[in-house]
A protein has these predicted regions:
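Bacterial N-terminal signal peptides that target proteins for export
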Residues: 1-7
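Cleavable N-terminal signal peptides
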Residues: 8-9, 20
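Transmembrane beta-barrel domains of Gram-negative outer membranes and organellar outer membranes
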Residues: 22-308
Length: 308
């Protein structure tokens, strides 16, 4: 064995290629939990921390996001998430504010899974309850967002482009609709482009890369928001979020930058940094594999392995 995995990983990479990854699996592909884009895969996970530091011309915002997703059946999941925010405005004379954001509840169903073509599609409905602190910007009216999610690996590229096969795409698109008609309805679309070193090693060519590089996945996300009506009607914001994650069978750790790509986005953000700590709880706590529909489930097979 090349190197001990340390406290984060007890798994033995050399024992079986692909054994390290068993979450978000479609065929030989393991999709990550993106930074901004919604994960297309229903799964059991606990995002214990999603810290984000945003710097803008009108102040600085520090947020700590968290969320729990639980599978109800093999293709259906329920997510609860929120965040704590600390806002330091400019000028300093303006009041400092901190508190919790609203509670989000998301139902997700994967209606299409094609392991051979590494393709998956889901539908989801996210609703937001007005439970947060108004002084940090938490809306005091409920809202909801129906959206479509998709994921696709580039495993079908010809041999001449085999080193592009580790590329994969995840995305989501949907309308953020407020119950309060005075608020803006927005069309949001996020795209995550991933390059998987584990996939390169296992499905294309084994370069013998050592841990932890062998578990790295590059991720660049493009985040779009377009106002459909209200104060933001006709106004589009575009951001880019480049970063990378480390992912093994138990945890995903990642860091990314966040930058505006047009003037409307720059009015909201100069730059930001976002982190993620995501625990795959069904391998850490096997009893969490129990599902209301289907009962206790076996461990998710590693990428590239057919399981029940």
């Amino acid at each position: 064995m090349r190197k001990q995995m340390g406290a984060v990983g007890i798994l033995l990479w050399g024992m079986a290629a692909g054994r390290a990854h068993a979450h978000g699996v479609v065929g030989q592909r393991s999709f990550i939990e993106p930074f901004i884009t919604e994960d297309v895969n229903p799964k059991n996970e606990f995002v214990i921390a999603r810290p984000e530091w945003d710097h803008a011309r009108d102040g600085r915002t520090l947020s700590f996001g968290f969320g729990l997703e639980k599978k109800i059946s093999d293709r259906f999941s329920l997510t609860l998430d929120s965040s704590w925010l600390d806002i330091t405005p400019k000028p300093a004379a303006e009041p400092h504010a901190s508190g919790f954001d609203n509670l989000g509840v998301t139902l997700k169903y994967a209606f299409f899974i094609d392991p051979v073509h590494e393709a998956i599609a889901s539908i989801a409905l996210e609703s937001t309850a007005p439970t947060g602190t108004e002084k940090v910007g938490a809306e005091q009216n409920a809202s909801f967002k129906p959206f479509l999610l998709y994921g696709k690996g580039l495993n079908e590229l010809p041999d001449a482009l085999e080193y592009l096969r580790p590329l994969g795409v995840q995305g989501d698109a949907g309308f953020e609709i407020a119950i309060d008609r005075a608020r803006t309805t927005a069309l949001a679309h996020n795209v995550a482009i991933e390059y998987s070193i584990p996939y390169l090693q296992q499905a294309v060519h084994d370069f013998g890369l050592a841990w932890p590089l062998s578990n790295f996945i590059g991720d660049t996300e493009f985040n779009f928001e377009h106002g459909v009506n209200g104060e933001e009607q006709g106004r589009s914001k575009v951001f880019v979020t480049p970063g990378f994650v480390y992912m093994d069978r138990w945890v995903e750790l990642g860091v990314a930058g966040r930058f505006p790509l047009n003037q409307a986005a720059n009015d909201e953000l100069d730059w930001g940094v976002i982190f993620i700590v995501d625990l795959f709880i069904d391998d850490i706590l096997p009893w969490t594999r129990w599902q209301p529909i289907g009962g206790m489930r076996p461990p998710t097979p590693p990428a590239g392995v057919t399981g029940s």
